[in-house]
C-alpha cells in the first residue's frame, strides 16, 4: 500500500509513525530537510520544497500512491490537494478553497459572520493603513479592549502580535499594523481583533466533507519559558488527559466547542465545497464560553504528537475514510491515557535562534525512559544531526495518569546535548492548577 506523505516536521513524523503501524504501508515522503525519523520510515524520499507543486506532481507520477496525506499548511495553500485529486489520488488534506479556513483569516471571520456561528469576536478587516483602521482601534480602546493584529495570510505562526504580549498597547498595535502593510507581511492585508481573556485549548477533528469525528482535547503552551513567560512560539509542548477532556474544561464547554466546529464544517461546505482532512480549532475559554482564536487546516504541532500515539483505530483506515467520505461508517477510538509532549528548541528561539549547530540525541536513554521521540526541524548530514533554527525535537510521555506521563517526558527531555533549551513545567500539576484557578476567576 503506497502512501505519499508531504512534509518533514515533527507533526509529519507523528503521521508517519501512525501510518507505519499498519505493516502494509509503504511510505514515500516529499520533504525539504532530511528528517531522520521520517527518512528511516520511508521507502523513498524526494527532497523538495513542500510548496513545489511540479515536484509534488513528478514524485506522485513516479510512485503512483494509493493515497496521499498532506502534513503542513503551506502545500494546502498552493493547491497540492487539488493537484493530487485531479491525478485521481485520494487525498487527506483540504483543497485550496476550503483550506482558506487557515490560509485566509478574513475568510474565516467572514464565514463566522455570514453563517452566524457562535464563538466569534469583534473584528475588522483592512486592505490598507488609514483612518478606518485607526478609528477601529480607537473604538476598541474606548471599550477598554486590547487588540490583536493578524496578517491575513500565512506567516508560519510568526506574524500575529498581541497587546500585552509583543505589543505594549493599542497605539503600538497601530505602528505594527502599518509595518505589516509596508513590508507586505502575510500578503499585506490585516485583521484587527479584540484580545480574548481566558485559557486556551485545542480541539481536533477528522473531517470527510460532511462528518466530523472529534479527538481528545489538548492544551498547548505557546510561551517560550516556564510559567508562561517570554515570547510566543510555535508551541513548546502540550498535554492531554485520560478522559479526553481537560481539567479546567466542563463537558458543557467542550460540547459547545464541538458544535462550533460542526457548524464551521457545514458552512465551509456551503461556501466553497467539502473540507476533507484534519481540522484544528484553537479556542479560548472565556467568561462567555469558548471563542475561536483561529483554525488550522491540519494537525497541530505539537498536538499531533499527543493524539496519534494513543489512536487505537488503524490510522490508514481513518485516512481512507476521510478521503472517501465514510467517517460515519467508522468507530474511531483513542486509548484512555494521559500524554505530555515537551520540545527542545534552539537557544534564542523564537527571536534569534542559533542555526546549523550539532544536536546529540541519546536515543537509547529516551527509549529506556519509555518516551516516544519525534524529530522536527532537524537536518541529518553525514550521520550527524543539525538544528535548523526552528523547534528541534520532542519527546512524549504516555501513561495512565498525567503526573506519570509528565515524569516520563521530563526524564527523556534531558537526553539532548547542544545549544538548545526546553520548558520543564509543561504537564506539571502546579501549572495545571493555575489554569483551573484562572477559569474559576473568569466564572466570577
UniProtKB/Swiss-Prot annotation:
SMART domains for the chain: GARS_A, GARS_C
UniProtKB keywords: ATP-binding, Ligase, Magnesium, Manganese, Metal-binding, Nucleotide-binding, Purine biosynthesis
InterPro entries: ATP-grasp, ATP_grasp_subdomain_1, PreATP-grasp_dom_sf, PRibGlycinamid_synth_ATP-grasp, PRibGlycinamide_synth, PRibGlycinamide_synth_C-dom, PRibGlycinamide_synth_C_sf, PRibGlycinamide_synth_CS
Residues given in the record as Mn(2+) 1 binding sites: 282, 294
CC cofactor: Mg(2+); Mn(2+)
Reaction(s) catalysed (UniProt annotation): 5-phospho-beta-D-ribosylamine + glycine + ATP = N(1)-(5-phospho-beta-D-ribosyl)glycinamide + ADP + phosphate + H(+)
GO terms of biological process kind: 'de novo' IMP biosynthetic process; purine nucleobase biosynthetic process
Binding positions for Mn(2+) 2 per the UniProt entry: 294, 296
Record family assignment: Belongs to the GARS family.
Protein name: Phosphoribosylamine--glycine ligase
Classification lineage: Archaea, Methanobacteriati, Methanobacteriota, Methanomada group, Methanococci
Amino acid at each position: 500500500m503506497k502512501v505519499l506523505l508531504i512534509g518533514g516536521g515533527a507533526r509529519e513524523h507523528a503521521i508517519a509513525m501512525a501510518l507505519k503501524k499498519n505493516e502494509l504501508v509503504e511510505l514515500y515522503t516529499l520533504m525539504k530537510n532530511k528528517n531522520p525519523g521520517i527518512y528511516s520510515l520511508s521507502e523513498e524520499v524526494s527532497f523538495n520544497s513542500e510548496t513545489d507543486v511540479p515536484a509534488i506532481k513528478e514524485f506522485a507520477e513516479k510512485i503512483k500512491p494509493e493515497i496521499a496525506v498532506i502534513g503542513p499548511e503551506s502545500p494546502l495553500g498552493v493547491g497540492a490537494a487539488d493537484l493530487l485529486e485531479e491525478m485521481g489520488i485520494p487525498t487527506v488534506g483540504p483543497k485550496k478553497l476550503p483550506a482558506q479556513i487557515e490560509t485566509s483569516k478574513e475568510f474565516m471571520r467572514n464565514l463566522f459572520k455570514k453563517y452566524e456561528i457562535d464563538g466569534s469576536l469583534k473584528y475588522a478587516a483592512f486592505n490598507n493603513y488609514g483612518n478606518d483602521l485607526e478609528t477601529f482601534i480607537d473604538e476598541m480602546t474606548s471599550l477598554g479592549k486590547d487588540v490583536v493584529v493578524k496578517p491575513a495570510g500565512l506567516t508560519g505562526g510568526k506574524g500575529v502580535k498581541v497587546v500585552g504580549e509583543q505589543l505594549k498597547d493599542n497605539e503600538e498595535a497601530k505602528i505594527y499594523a502599518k509595518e505589516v502593510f509596508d513590508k507586505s507581511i502575510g500578503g499585506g492585508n490585516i485583521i484587527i481583533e479584540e484580545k480574548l481573556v481566558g485559557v486556551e485549548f485545542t480541539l481536533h477533528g477528522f473531517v470527510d466533507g460532511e462528518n466530523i469525528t472529534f479527538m481528545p482535547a489538548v492544551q498547548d503552551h505557546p510561551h517560550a519559558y516556564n510559567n508562561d513567560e517570554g515570547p510566543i512560539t510555535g508551541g513548546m509542548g502540550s498535554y492531554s488527559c485520560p478522559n479526553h477532556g481537560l481539567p479546567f474544561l466542563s463537558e458543557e464547554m467542550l460540547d459547545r466547542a464541538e458544535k462550533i466546529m460542526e457548524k464551521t464544517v457545514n458552512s465551509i461546505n456551503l461556501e466553497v465545497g467539502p473540507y476533507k482532512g484534519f481540522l484544528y480549532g484553537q479556542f479560548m475559554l472565556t467568561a462567555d464560553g469558548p471563542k475561536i482564536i483561529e483554525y488550522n487546516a491540519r494537525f497541530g504541532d505539537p498536538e499531533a504528537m499527543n493524539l496519534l500515539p494513543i489512536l487505537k483505530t488503524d490510522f490508514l483506515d481513518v485516512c481512507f475514510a476521510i478521503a472517501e467520505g465514510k467517517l460515519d461508517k467508522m468507530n474511531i477510538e483513542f486509548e484512555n491515557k494521559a500524554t505530555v509532549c515537551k520540545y527542545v528548541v534552539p537557544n534564542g528561539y523564537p527571536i534569534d535562534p542559533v542555526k546549523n549547530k550539532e544536536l546529540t540525541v541519546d536515543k537509547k536513554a529516551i527509549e529506556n525512559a519509555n518516551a516516544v521521540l519525534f524529530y522536527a526541524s532537524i537536518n541529518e548530514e553525514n550521520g550527524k544531526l543539525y538544528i535548523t533554527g526552528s523547534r528541534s525535537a520532542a519527546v512524549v510521555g504516555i501513561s495512565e495518569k498525567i503526573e506519570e506521563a509528565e515524569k516520563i517526558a521530563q526524564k527523556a527531555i534531558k537526553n539532548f546535548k547542544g545549544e538548545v533549551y526546553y520548558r520543564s513545567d509543561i504537564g506539571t500539576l502546579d501549572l495545571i492548577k493555575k489554569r483551573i484557578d484562572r477559569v474559576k476567576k473568569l466564572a466570577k
